[in-house]
Amino acid sequence: MLSIIVPSYNRKAEVPALLESLTQQTSSNFEVIIVDDCSKERVVVEQSYSFPVTVIRNETNQGAAESRNVGARTSKGDWLLFLDDDDCFMPEKCEKVLQVIEQNPNINFIYHPAKCEMVNEGFTYVTQPIEPQEISTERILLANKIGGMPMIAIKKEMFLKIGGLSTALRSLEDYDFLLKLLQEPSFTPYKINEPLTYCTFHTKRSSVSTDTTNTQKAIDYIREHYVKTVEQARNFDINASYILAYPHIMNLSRKAAKYYFDIFKKTKSIKQFIITLVILISPKLAINLKRLGK
């Protein structure tokens, strides 16, 4: 059985739609664990579904990382999936994950692309994760080319073995989790080559904060714990600039240009110089470069 873990904080209204979307799964061999992170309005599920639903409420606000850890420790399934309350799984996701697990008994990690919608810009794109044989600490320090928590499945035993998500961080917890996973010698990944999660992104959303204090702390933490070589340091310096640019570009702020210019100086890439100029002209136009696969 699969366990789908959903952290929720002050988004009670999103929960019914999320559960309704899971009724479309072509396999119902899963449970759902909603971890209410001490929301102002308690999450209550009164409707019954074809799959078991458990709601756990944290007594104090713990953050998304510890909420996922709580769900994992409580879960009854052998494999863990993670879903945020503003994303959804494709109808065939659970069935395909279960098939892969059955056909590949030695694996302990599954990942796949996501279909992403830029809501305000009116277009979608599909992420392009790297192949299992390409995964290395060096490669992931350069960019997270695996995906976030809604794009992975992990054997519960492996999740607990590496200690789950770090509660020392309030940003980049999923990225840190992948890097920690790569340090485990028994890590055995498998890639499904089709998008099985649908994610939505909104530019100029009030929840996208440009305060990068927690992000900078997470960057420093990751540098201290995973960067060991000159190549790793160079790769992560480049990625840190991308990470710091993200909230600014999502807020359509020209401040993102500073970070892309930093990347240009580090890489001497003409592409990054052009992106810098595009951001200075129009951050919205820079977002639309994804429409062209740039």
Swiss-Prot record:
The keyword Ion transport does not apply. This is Uncharacterized glycosyltransferase HI_1696. It comes from the Bacteria. Its EC number is 2.4.-.-. Transmembrane segments: none annotated. SUPFAM superfamilies: Nucleotide-diphospho-sugar transferases. It is an enzyme of class 2 (transferase). Pfam families: Glycos_transf_2. The keyword Translocase does not apply. Keywords: Glycosyltransferase, Transferase. GO terms for biological process: biosynthetic process. One of its GO terms (molecular function) is glycosyltransferase activity.
